[in-house]
Amino acid sequence: MAAPEQPLPMSRGCQNSSSLSPPRGDRTLLVRHLPAELTAEEKEDLLKYFGAQSVRDLSDKGRLKHTAFATFPNEKTAVKALTRLHQLKLLGHTLVVEFAKEQDRVHSPCPSLGTEKKKRSDDPVEDDKEKKELDCLTIENGIAPNHGLTFPLNSCLKYMYPPPSSTILANIVNALASVPKFYVQVLHLMNKMNLPTPFGPITTRPPMYEDYMPLHAPLPPTSPQPPEEPPLPDEDEELSSKESEYESSDDEDRQRMTKLMELANLQPKRPKPIKQRHVRKKRKIKDMLNIPSSASHSLHPVLLPSDVFDQPQPVGNKKIEFHISTDMQVAFKKDLEKQQNCEEENSDLPATEADASNIGFGKIFPQPNLNITEEIKDDSDEMPSECISRRELEKGRISREEMETLSVFRSYEPGEPNCRIYVKNLAKHVQEKDLKFIFGRYVDFSSETQRIMFDIRLMKEGRMKGQAFIGLPNEKAAAKALKEANGYVLFGKPMVVQFARSARPKQDSKEGKRKC
């Protein structure tokens, strides 16, 4: 064998460039924004796939990084490649393709070594032309040339997929979750087929083929495999036997596929529910008498009559007892002494008066209640149940030490005495009736003038929220209310009571001023 010819050393100016590129430079394309993930060989294969005759890949740095020059055999092929490559999305990058300018003519790519070897090989030129034509045919008539599938579609090719099952669907779901592009393409396909969007609630599970697979229709047996070395001497007989075997296997596969598709398209029949007739037995009187109460089966607890109704108390002879205290006995003794003194005095009167006094039941004197008099002396300020008592006020007040610790009472001053008091630091839940319950004890409601002068103004909104102005009958009542109610805790907050700064209310008569 002859040794292969060594390629001639190429000069720096690329001597063969004059034969490849015309003076206009319409056959050379400049491809920009190539993905950085591709190697130089992959970029060259990509551009040659679109009909490039020679490719020169530039460096990954500088102004022309990720670019390449591609030279095509003629202008028509270059225009066709430009229309197919321009704005093509490849690995997240959009290619920009344009014809090389005059200033780039100096950088026009030199033919690769592989092309020179092909030209210098012993194959004739006609074989190269036929191969190029076949390449163009495969590119134009391929299955998906944009995705790299350049071979034509086989007309005899048919797919035989099994019917869907739970495992197959689970594998598809796993693939959807792991490959985002596949998930997006499935959504596009559902949109094209006008299927409902899967973004709503979970839909009902359709009947699966594997759940309703009929048992009486098994799959047809597979054809026996042909022997590895058939004992046929002639080549023609071998070819004919192979063709017949392949045809028979294809026919069997088609029949098997049609049967599978028919079984997959069959709608499964739902099993009809078998109604069981319940024969009701006739109950006997003996059984009905011994039936347990239905209350035991109920969800609610058993209630006895004593839990619902008040039990009548047995009426008996009640013993009435009188407990007379020693004070009452002393009072009785005093009354008896008074009566005796009166009788002695009446004995000196004339008989007519004595007879008049003896007519009827005589005089009945009320018994003095010593406990009430003592309570009045001890607590002369106790009010009826409508108002608060002094004991409750004292219990509800905070001590002076606690007042010193609170910030509300630090700069406390009672103010100038008058008949109106100012209350602040009131809780949100305080109402006028609460203030009336506290400060009403300083008003005599039997007097009409005091009832008119008693006034409560509670601020519930605005800047004065939580404050109140209370008008009392006179300064004495106001001073007493300030002394006793200051620091009283109402709804968790101690009240701060002061004399109001406003002037005294103007009155026409001098008597009104005296009352204040």
From Swiss-Prot:
Q: Where is the composition biased (Pro residues)?
A: 217-230
Q: Where is the RRM domain?
A: 27-102, 419-502
Alphabetical list of InterPro entries matching this protein: Nucleotide-bd_a/b_plait_sf (IPR012677), RBD_domain_sf (IPR035979), RBM40_RRM1 (IPR034147), RBM41/RNPC3 (IPR045164), RRM_dom (IPR000504)
Q: What are the BP-aspect GO terms?
A: mRNA splicing, via spliceosome
Q: Where is the composition biased (Basic residues)?
A: 269-283
Q: Where in the cell is it found?
A: Nucleus
Q: Which UniProt keywords apply?
A: Nucleus, Phosphoprotein, Repeat, RNA-binding
Start and end residues of each stretch annotated as Disordered: 1-27, 106-130, 210-254, 264-283
Described function: Participates in pre-mRNA U12-dependent splicing, performed by the minor spliceosome which removes U12-type introns. U12-type introns comprises less than 1% of all non-coding sequences. Binds to the 3'-stem-loop of m(7)G-capped U12 snRNA.
Q: How does it assemble?
A: Component of the U11/U12 snRNPs that are part of the U12-type spliceosome. Found in a complex with m(7)G-capped U12 snRNA. Interacts with PDCD7.
- This protein is called what? RNA-binding region-containing protein 3
Please tell me the species this chain comes from: Bos taurus
